[in-house]
Structures are given as structure tokens and as C-alpha cells.
């Protein structure tokens, strides 16, 4: 049909009057325009329209083209058609239907001003006119104007199901509840469009009670469509009711209802955002989801696969399946997928994350700011700044040097890698800084124990401090023993409502007071807290009780910790065992360890890392799993022998007291992972050209013990080198028999 239509000689048609043009030909012309539009050739349709006789340029033809422009967001052709129509008044009368098409076209194309002008000049309007403009405001993000227009509409005509569903799309709880009530009054609540919109509206409130109101609406719907199910799952997900969301999904699946990409994305979000799910439930559901995505073919969609990767990595810490899934995506891996897998490994396996970043570059993909941010997080988990320097160069080459977020990430990475000078250089070179920039620099100084530098930086801060700012300041004062300065900063937080102390600030103050052996004041702060102390507070107190041998308060903190984090956390048992050991109560210490074994609680393995010749070497206490174990032991033995001549005496309080053989007890103490790492670095340094390097860097996953701290101080004097150690709390700069922490850590 369209071929014959396009071949019509319009010159021949013009010789006939409009009276002789059959209405069938006019309908055929309109249908021909629609066919061209459906085939994606809107330009040809518009060209054909302009070259047609006036008699064929009917209101139906205009309407068809306005609708096409709306669907394809073609504002330019829409405006030209509107001008053409106004310049041919015999083609256009004040027609409500045609004006509605115009409003819809302008609204869909994002020009809400023109849509409003058409609406305001209409001599009469119907429900479609109001709905089209309301929808336009909502889609443009101007929900307030849309709701005001809806309120005005009620004095002119009744809304229909499409009006209500459009208004509900942007409503908050109170106005949304009123619209829901109106729907019930008008009998429009039975409409699937209205019901779905009501469910979504309640879900957006992020409130459990509202989610159950959505559930009531959901259960009342007799014939649910896929959008209904997805809306209910999304509502529970938004309200952090993951278990409920999964329950809806399971029911949906058992009822034989199909699912789509939106379903799977909402369920994945439910799994890693909700706090009401236990690991076993997450694991079971994740495996089922993975199976369903494979069977349905949706696993080939990048967003779905990336969401699954996030669940595997963040919730299950199952990096094997996470990586396997990523490798199966070889045909559809975009930058979002790469960002997901790099982020997954950034904390768990930083070296793998760096390797993945290298693979991304080999595949000729251009990293975005999120990629660089994730890989810099991985750099922060490595021993040295070597990789951070390389990524920094690529950030500059990629044109991201002015990006504040990336500069903040660079400061964090360099600080964690021990390069405080590079942190300062990045900070000083920044064109603009936000509060995170200042906080990152303050945290860097705090991490390295530079309390004399942190306070001047804080005084120069030209942005209002936030909660994290005071955490950095209080932590620095705590680790440096600057109690009075710390208390002054803490008291200043009460001066403004926006800086009132939160749990973490109280934890810092309690840590600061108890480190200084001011336990009575620490107890008083706990009693005066406006909220219940959390695990962080009791852990801070427990650590200092161990250091100063306060058994009574340590027992209280350990018991509170067990109540809060369940008896499966190793911290309370180990710290109490150490406290009992220190005071010579070995039976009580052993009972604490046996209680830990009864609950099958596993202690975090003691691991250390050092980098030699661009290769990272890992050490576990006792040197297990290393082929060069005997050689490292021999080197360590030599070091210990020399250090004992310098006055080193093993601190037996740091040894495990459940070993009956005293010689074995000392042997166990001397084979802590950081000592092995140092011995290896010394041994390898003699073999390589790096023997003249005056810095040895070691990273440790737990807090350094008293004995190892004493050992490192003397070793720095013996070797004539600086030993830079990062433990779970902070950096220790050992040099000439002293430490930057002044033995206060």
C-alpha cells in the first residue's frame, strides 16, 4: 500500500477538488504515514506530508506525525509541524484532540514550557489534556507543579486511571495516601495501572509500615501482571525487607509467573541491601537466581550479571563463583561489568583487582572515574605505593586530574601505602577541595601519628567539618595520648546541632581515655551517652583494659561484646585471655580459650606481607606453607641473637599460655608473622641490588603485639634502616630504636 501511496502524483490530485477526494484515500494517506514511522523513517513521512496536497494534510495526519515525534523524542520536527499547522488555519481549528497530541509531544520531548503554552490557550480541555500535562511535569522531575495541576484539575473534571497512576508516580506518603483514597472513592483502585502505582508509591517511602500497606493493595488485586509483582518486590527491597521480597519472588515463581530483567535486579538489590537475611538464605537464593538467569538467557544482560557479581562478592564473599560468572560474560562485558568485578576484588584480593584492571586495558576499554576509584581502593590494600603511582599516571593521562573524587581516592591510597609525602602533594595540587578531601588528609596524618600536623590542617579547613572530620581528629588525639586536646575537640562538637557526637565519636573518646588509663572517666562517658553503646565502644574499652590489666572492666566489656555481636566473635575471648595471662591467671585464660572453642569460634589468622622485587610475599605465624621456611628461620635466629646482645628480652605476656613447654612458648612468640617478614626482607635484600635501600615496608592484618613492637624498634637500630609497618590500627615508623607512636598504640 505504501509503495503505491508514495508514487501518487500529487499534481494530478490537485486538479481535483477536495470534494472528489474519497475519504478512503485520506485514510490511506494517514496509514501510509504511520507505516513509514513504524519502519523508522520519520523523515520520509514528514517530507511526504509536506509535499502532499492541502486536502490530504488533515488533522488525523497531523495527529499521526505528532504522535511519532513524541515516541521518537523528535522535538525539531514536532516544532516545524506545529508552525506549519498554524500557518495553514484551514487545516486547523481549535480541536481538543489535536491540542492533546501537541501537549503530549512537547511533554515527551522535554519542552514542558511549550506544552504548558498549548494547554493554557485551549478554549476547552478534557481529562486527556490535564493528564498529558501532569505526566509531562512528573517526567520532567517537577513533581510539585504536577501535583498542583492535579489539584486544580479536580475542580474542572474527574481524573481517570492514567491521571492517578501518573500522579502517584511522584507522590510522597501523605499526598500519595490522599490520592489512594480518591482512587477508592472513584472506584479506580481496581485498575491495574492505579494499583501498581499505589504499590510503588508506598514502596518509595522506605518505611516498613508503608510496605505493608503496599502488600494489602497487592493482595487485593485479582489479576496481577508482571509489573504488579515487580512493584511489590521493589517495595519490599526499598524498605530493606529482603526476606519479604524473596518470599514474593518465590511465590511468583511457584505460580508460574514469568520474570524479567527488572525482577532479577530488584531481587539482587534485596539480597545485598537488606539486614534481615542470614548468609544461608542469601546463598540459597543467589544460587537459584543464578540458575534462573542462565536458563532464561538473562545472564547475558550485563546489568543482571553485574548485579549477581555484587551479591556473590559483597554478601557471600564467594569470589570464586563471582569471578567464574564474570568470565562467562566474555561476550557482553562492558565498563560497568569490569567496574563490578574490580570493586569485588578491591578489598578481598587487591592484587587480583590490579590484574583485572590490566586486563581491562588490554581489551582496549577506557576506564571511567568509577574504575579508577575502585582500583585505587585496591592499591590502598597493598604494601607499597608502586601500583598507586602507576594508576595516578593513568588518571592524569585519562584527563581525570581535576576530578575531586579521584584526588580524594589518591590521597587515601597513598596514605594507606605509607607515602604521606605523596598525599600532601596531591592535596596541595588540588584546584578544588570538598569536605572529603580535607577529611582524607586529616585521616592520613592520623594514620601516621602526625598529630602536630593534623591540627594546623584542621584550622586551615575552609569548609564546615562533618562527622568524619571529628573522627579523624579524635583518633589522632587518642593514638598520640593528647587527651586534653581530644576532650576540648569533643566538647566543641556540642556547640552546633549538625556536629553533635554520634556513636563513633563516643567510641573514640572512650578509647582515648582508657588508653590513658583514665578508666573512671571512660565509665562515666559510657553512662552519660544518649544512646546505647555499640560493639565498637566495648572493643575500644576492652583493648585498653588488656594493655593496662584492668580485669574487672575488661570482663564487663567482654560480656557486653558477646551480647551485642553474639558469642561467635573471637575478639572478646582473645582479649580476655590476654588480660588473664598478663596478670598470671592462666586457668581463667585457658577457660576463655576453651569457651571460644566450644562455640567453634575461629581466630583471624595472623598474616604479614612485604614486597621484594615487585613481588608481594605473604607470611603466617609459624612460617607455614612457605617453601623457604627453614632459610627464613635461620635468618630470624641470627637477628634474634644479635638483638638479645643489644638487650632484647622476649615479652612472654604476648605468648600463648596454653603451651606447657616454656621453650616452645618462646619459639611460638618469636615466629610471629611480622618477624618472619622482616627476616625475609633482610635475607633477600642481601641477595639483590636493593641492599642499599634504607626502607623496609611490612603490612599486617592484626594489631602488632608488644613483643614484636620492641623487636622492630631494636631491629631498626641494628639494621640501620627505617621499618615502616602498617598494622590493623595505624602506621609505625621504626627508626633508631624508637617508634613514631611513642609506644602509645
Curated annotation (Swiss-Prot):
Query: What are the disulfide bonds?
Result: none
From the UniProt entry, list the residue stretches annotated as the region Type DYW motif. 645-745
First and last residues of every PPR repeat: 58-88, 95-125, 126-160, 191-224, 225-259, 260-296, 301-332, 334-367, 368-402, 403-437, 438-464, 466-496, 502-532
Q: Which InterPro entries match?
A: DYW_dom (IPR032867), E_motif (IPR046848), Pentatricopeptide_rpt (IPR002885), PPR_At4g14850-like_plant (IPR046960), TPR-like_helical_dom_sf (IPR011990)
Region feature Type E(+) motif, mapped onto this chain? 614-644
Q: Which domain of life is it from?
A: Eukaryota
- List UniProt keywords, sorted A-Z: Repeat
GO annotation, biological process: RNA modification
> GO terms for molecular function, please?
RNA binding; zinc ion binding
Give a single Pfam family match: E_motif
- Please give the residue ranges the record annotates as the region Type E motif: 537-613
Q: Which family does it belong to?
A: Belongs to the PPR family. PCMP-H subfamily.
Which PANTHER family does the annotation name?
PENTACOTRIPEPTIDE-REPEAT REGION OF PRORP DOMAIN-CONTAINING PROTEIN (PTHR47926:SF382), PENTATRICOPEPTIDE REPEAT-CONTAINING PROTEIN (PTHR47926)
Name the UniProt record assigns to this protein: Pentatricopeptide repeat-containing protein At1g71420
The record lists the organism as Arabidopsis thaliana (Mouse-ear cress)
Lineage of source species = Eukaryota, Viridiplantae, Streptophyta, Embryophyta, Tracheophyta
Gene it is expressed from: PCMP-H70
